[in-house]
């Protein structure tokens, strides 16, 4: 029943995690039969996963998955009388803070932007992204009304998302 309280992109992300990472393992087991040892086994499988290039899931992605299953059990405790959340006894997985981001130096950016000097639309877009630090979705949601050339300001108050093939602008 949380769908109405979430932005479409957030809801789609949560649904994906539930459908791909939680339901295949726990979907047919009653919640009150899931034990902390089951959660630990599942966590260990996720932390051991490697893709075809040998890369594991990032620590922040693991934390996001773990937060989702913890929230499901918290909801069951609060609204459906589940005695306790097995995730609390199992412990956490992953880490909250993302890896430190790497940024281009001005020289690196100048090398990159030279390729777009004859493409004004892309040149303006990449210059704006680099010098403001806005995200791609925020950039794609901008309208002419958001830009005040006299005050040299850009109002960033919405985000572009593609959710299940549907293009959305969210605030």
Say what each PLM segment does.
Residues 152-154:
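Hydrophobic residues embedded in beta-strands of well-ordered beta-sheets
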Residues 157-158:
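Radical SAM [4Fe-4S] cluster-binding motif and immediate context
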Residues 98, 164-171:
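C-terminal catalytic core of Y-nucleophile DNA break-rejoin enzymes
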Residues 2-83, 98:
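N-terminal core-binding DNA-recognition domain of tyrosine site-specific recombinases/integrases
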Residues 55-59, 63, 78, 82-142, ...:
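Basic, Lys/Arg- and aromatic-enriched nucleic-acid-binding interface segment
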Residues 17, 45-48, 68, 114-118, ...:
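Residues within well-ordered alpha-helical secondary structure of globular protein domains
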Residues 31, 87-90, 168-171:
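Short clusters of hydrophobic/aromatic residues that line enzyme substrate/ligand-binding pockets
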């Amino acid at each position: 029943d949380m769908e109405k309280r979430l932005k479409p992109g957030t809801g789609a992300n949560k649904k994906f995690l539930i459908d791909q990472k939680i339901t295949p393992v726990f979907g047919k087991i009653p919640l009150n039969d899931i034990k902390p040892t089951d959660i630990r086994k599942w966590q260990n499988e996720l932390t051991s996963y490697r893709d075809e290039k040998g890369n594991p899931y990032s620590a922040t992605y693991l934390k996001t998955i773990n937060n989702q299953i913890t929230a499901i059990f918290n909801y069951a405790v609060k609204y459906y009388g589940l005695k306790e959340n097995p995730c609390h006894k199992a412990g956490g997985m992953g880490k909250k803070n993302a890896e430190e981001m790497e940024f281009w130096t001005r020289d690196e950016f100048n090398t990159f932007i030279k390729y777009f000097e004859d493409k004004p639309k892309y040149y303006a877009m990449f210059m704006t992204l680099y010098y403001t630090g806005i995200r791609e979705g925020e950039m794609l949601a901008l309208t002419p009304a958001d830009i005040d050339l006299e005050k040299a300001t850009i109002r960033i108050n919405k985000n572009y998302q593609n959710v299940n093939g549907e293009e959305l602008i969210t605030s």
